[in-house]
Amino acid sequence: MCYDIKASYEAQLKRASQKGDLAAVEEILDNLIPFTDLPIHHACGFCHPVLLIYTNESPDFPTVATWGLVPHWVKDEEQQKKIWNNTLNARGETIFEKPSFRQAAKNNRCIIYIDGFYEHHHFNKKTYPFFIQRKDKNPIALAGLWSEWINPETNGRMNTFSIVTTEGNFLMAKIHNNPKIKGPRMPLILSDEQEDEWLNPT
């Protein structure tokens, strides 16, 4: 699974910075960053930190969003608080089946750029955190799903997201050995070539 991450300004601004639009980057720093919890050296999803995501509707300019997807059909704050601890991650194998993710999997995809993520190794009844990052330390692009939820009690709007996970590879199988989970998991990491394809599947 993926519940703990590190996210710096530089990582979160990767896609906008690549476009070379300095005015846009400045606008993000001035008008969006203050509404996030960045920079994050160790964020736990269960604390529902606020990050930047790049959505299929705005692929080059980020959106402020809270970790823990809240589907559009959630009726009130009580239901919202119950569901978003269960939607921090979305199993890639079932995103088109689960009611919480079906709509987003078809229409609302996003990318989250991070410096790395933490996974815990279990040994002798203790857990040991491992920090996973790229060898070149460049930002990691994670596949995500997002949703806009309108609070019917206040009419307030909130963007939320979930990180898509997949079966752990050989390396992650050695690290992510939680006995309570069936098989190792890891976030779905996108290559540069896969980013646009993820946002706009055919």
Predicted feature locations:
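Short linear sequence motif anchored by a di-proline
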Residues: 1-202
